[in-house]
């Protein structure tokens, strides 16, 4: 049974969230009546309003109006007045993943999972499918620069979605193709232990129907181990690993471009296909790996090598994924969402390969619990940065944990041998501290999932202002 047209007005609590906004937009484009509420008048909220979706700022029971269905994310607390009112009215309350699953039933679906790289990989798969004329519908966890949004309504039979594993609800998604980029011990507050995370990703792949397939990264030990345990589903492996079915090789980094070859081997027939001199306008082996996952999907769906190369070369990137926000005095300033040690290490390694000068990393740790559980990993992930500026922890609603803060992390980084790690006590001091260390040819990379993105946007003009004062 499919989602009927006459479901009435759908109300989203927290509609401005990156996942919720995409689902709301696609529902609206399908002709359903959609409205919602959010705590702030964010860019996502403004974008939805421009499309004709009514959005209330603040959560109040009366916002429900004539709603027949209410959609919530796991971030919405049971004490939310709109949620309480919905239950008093006996309205169906639908989890975000459940509504996404309903949308996926309209299409053949590709779900992109993994601890890191999901958003970029989702964007790359969408780009290659579009280049191949498949006109996909897309719901992503980040703003795709080519679309200016995280959602796209296509006319084709394929849908590409980012599968969020944080609360386990990604297992509800009816995917025909399941991609796993990597598996790390994240979200243990939900899963309890790493074995439960492993089990969830195994189920994610085994949930695909017999006519579907999994695409799995052979470079990641946890994923490689999982490949060996899946017996009854078709699996395509990818990576730099010589044993991968879809392998990238001959990598060259040219500024902020990556140039590489891909070899595709069909295990059953022995057939080989070479894609030579592929160009992607993003640096870094982690991004090449994500592109190779997208190539594996596109190739299996019958997209030509020529269209794959064309799509890859035209890829416009994802907002907050090594996004250039401006330049000052020959210094380039980048904004990145990286907030886990694995992500930070990969971004800084990519910056090191692309930059002719020095790397200045500015990081705002996100959540005390994450910093506490991964403290030693954070202390070791900045080695590719010549200078490190660490801002206070962005709490995201958490209580502080004694002894777990940015000053402690600075001390640990320095005791581990790093030559230049400093505490950045406030955003107001950032321009002066950057101006003190940055020279022409350097990269300044701001990393984090909190408010640091606004610092990255403001920094180029702030630095210009400092130059004006000194003149």
Curated annotation (Swiss-Prot):
One GO process term, biological-process aspect: peptidoglycan biosynthetic process
Keywords: ATP-binding, Cell cycle, Cell division, Cell shape, Cell wall biogenesis/degradation, Cytoplasm, Ligase, Nucleotide-binding, Peptidoglycan synthesis
InterPro entries: Mur-like_cat_sf, Mur_ligase_C, Mur_ligase_C_dom_sf, Mur_ligase_cen, Mur_ligase_N, MurCDEF_pg_biosynth, UDP-N-AcMur_Ala_ligase_MurC
Catalytic activity: UDP-N-acetyl-alpha-D-muramate + L-alanine + ATP = UDP-N-acetyl-alpha-D-muramoyl-L-alanine + ADP + phosphate + H(+)
Binding residues for ATP: 114-120
Residue ranges of coiled coil: none
Enzyme class, UniProt record, top EC level: ligase
Record keyword Cytoplasm present: yes
Protein localization: Cytoplasm
Pathway field: Cell wall biogenesis; peptidoglycan biosynthesis
Xref: Pfam families: Mur_ligase, Mur_ligase_C, Mur_ligase_M
UniProt keyword Cytoplasm present: yes
Record-linked SUPFAM superfamilies: MurCD N-terminal domain, MurD-like peptide ligases, catalytic domain, MurD-like peptide ligases, peptide-binding domain
EC number: 6.3.2.8
GO cellular component, one term: cytoplasm
Gene Ontology terms, MF aspect: ATP binding; UDP-N-acetylmuramate-L-alanine ligase activity
Family in the record: Belongs to the MurCDEF family.
Purpose of the protein: Cell wall formation.
Protein name: UDP-N-acetylmuramate--L-alanine ligase
Source species: Rhizobium etli (strain ATCC 51251 / DSM 11541 / JCM 21823 / NBRC 15573 / CFN 42)
């Amino acid at each position: 049974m499919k989602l009927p047209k006459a479901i009435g007005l759908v109300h989203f609590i927290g509609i401005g969230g990156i996942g919720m906004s995409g689902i709301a937009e696609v529902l609206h484009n399908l002709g359903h009546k959609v409205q919602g509420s959010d705590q702030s008048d964010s860019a996502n909220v403004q974008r939805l309003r421009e499309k004709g979706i009514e959005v209330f700022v603040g959560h109040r029971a009366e916002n429900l109006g004539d709603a027949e269905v209410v959609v919530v994310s796991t971030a919405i607390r049971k004490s939310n007045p709109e949620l309480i009112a919905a239950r008093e009215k006996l309205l169906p309350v639908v989890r975000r993943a459940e509504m996404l699953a309903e949308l996926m039933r309209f299409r053949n679906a590709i779900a992109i999972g993994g601890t890191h790289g999901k958003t970029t990989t989702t964007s790359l798969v969408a780009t290659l499918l579009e280049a191949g004329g498949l006109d996909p519908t897309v719901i992503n966890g980040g703003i795709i620069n080519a679309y200016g949004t995280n959602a796209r309504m296509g006319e084709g039979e394929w849908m590409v979605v980012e599968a969020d594993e944080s609360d386990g609800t990604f297992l509800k998604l009816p995917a025909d193709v399941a991609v796993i980029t990597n598996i790390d011990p994240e979200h243990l507050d939900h899963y309890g232990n790493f074995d439960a995370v492993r089990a969830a990703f195994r189920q994610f792949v085994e949930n695909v129907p017999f006519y579907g397939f999994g695409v799995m990264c052979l470079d990641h030990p946890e994923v490689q181990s999982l490949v060996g345990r899946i017996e009854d589903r078709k699996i395509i492996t990818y990576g730099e690993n010589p044993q991968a079915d879809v392998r990238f090789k001959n990598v060259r980094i040219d500024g902020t471009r990556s140039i590489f070859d891909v070899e595709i081997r069909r295990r059953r027939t022995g057939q080989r296909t070479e894609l030579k001199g592929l160009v992607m306008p993003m640096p870094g082996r982690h991004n090449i790996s994500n592109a190779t996952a997208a190539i594996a999907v596109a190739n299996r769906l019958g997209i030509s090598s020529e269209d794959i190369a064309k799509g890859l070369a035209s890829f416009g990137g994802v907002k907050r994924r090594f996004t250039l926000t401006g330049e000052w005095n020959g210094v380039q300033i980048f904004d990145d969402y990286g907030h886990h040690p694995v992500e930070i290490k990969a971004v800084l390694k990519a910056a090191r390969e692309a930059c002719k000068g020095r790397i200045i990393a500015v990081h705002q740790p996100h959540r005390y619990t994450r910093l506490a559980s991964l403290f030693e990993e954070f202390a070791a992930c900045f080695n590719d940065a010549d200078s490190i500026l660490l801002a206070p922890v962005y709490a995201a609603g958490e209580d502080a944990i004694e002894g777990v803060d940015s000053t402690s992390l600075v001390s640990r980084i320095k005791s581990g041998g790093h030559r230049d790690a400093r505490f950045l006590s406030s955003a107001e001091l950032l321009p002066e501290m950057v101006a003190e260390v940055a020279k022409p040819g350097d990269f300044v990379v701001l990393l984090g999932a909190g408010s640091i993105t606004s610092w990255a946007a403001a920094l180029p003009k702030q630095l210009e202002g400092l130059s004006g004062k000194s003149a």
